[in-house]
Regions:
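Bacterial Sec-dependent N-terminal signal peptides
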Residues: 1-22
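N-terminal, active-site-proximal structural segment of metallo-dependent hydrolase catalytic domains
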Residues: 19-110, 118-126, 194-195
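Active-site-proximal beta-strand elements of phosphoester/diester hydrolases
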Residues: 28-36, 141-143, 172-182
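Acidic/His-rich structured neighborhood in mature extracellular/periplasmic domains
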Residues: 146-148, 154, 180, 187-191
Length: 211
């Protein structure tokens, strides 16, 4: 089967993998928008001022900790009714930096997860990342591919494409985590993002015939 997954908004995929003659096992994967997971510390060069204690959201440590707890409960409950172990990996969007991801996976509900993240050029500092359970999914390589603007539009810009390769159930799997511009952007901007994802997918499948 094809084992290249594109994780973006509105997708929840459940796949069965395994050798043809082996007992088949159910795995789940997911995508979740963290919706502005910011800490309370200013990142130099980033426009994160709204999410500071003296910013417009009055973003305090108490509010931050509450958001971490609430997110971890939701993420920790994903697909548990079908797969007791939870998702093998979860693509996430709108994480400010590695610090917030470290704080997130320290929460008891998802303490079994690790993460892959690269700092991108987004002006507000929000990025995509991949949370993964190392007991189910073993990461072998990863990289961030920057997006190109549509006709010079740097306002509605896709926040990079996180590519993560690894082993799931003994088979090679490659994931593209991406977060397109909102529906407030013009349709051609979103189509441009889709075409970039397709080009990446095609390139990956040409270079690895086993995907």
């Amino acid at each position: 089967m094809r084992k290249l997954l594109v994780l973006c908004s509105f997708w929840l995929c459940v796949a069965t993998l395994g050798a043809q003659n082996a007992e088949r096992k159910l795995y789940s994967v997911a995508f979740y928008n963290l919706e502005n997971l910011f800490d309370t510390i200013h990142d130099a060069g980033k426009n994160d001022y709204e999410f500071l204690p003296n910013g417009s959201y009055q973003w305090t440590a108490k509010k931050y900790e509450s958001k971490l707890q609430n997110l971890s409960k939701v993420l920790g409950s994903l697909s548990r009714d079908l797969v007791p172990e939870g998702p093998a990996f979860i693509g996430v969007a709108e994480a400010e930096n590695s610090r917030v991801l470290e704080d997130l996976v320290k929460q008891p509900a998802i303490s079994n997860y690790e993460f892959v993240h690269y700092e991108g050029p987004d002006r507000r500092g929000i990025d995509c990342a991949l949370l993964y359970d190392p007991k189910q999914f073993s990461v072998t390589h990863s990289k961030l591919v920057l997006s190109t603007p549509f006709e010079g539009d740097t306002v509605h810009l896709t926040r990079g494409f996180l590519i993560v390769g690894g082993q799931l159930a003994g088979e090679r799997v490659c994931v593209i985590v991406n977060h397109w511009p909102s529906r407030g952007a013009k349709s051609p901007v979103r189509v441009h993002a889709a075409r970039q994802v397709k080009a990446l997918k095609d390139s990956l499948m040409r270079s690895d015939k086993k995907l």
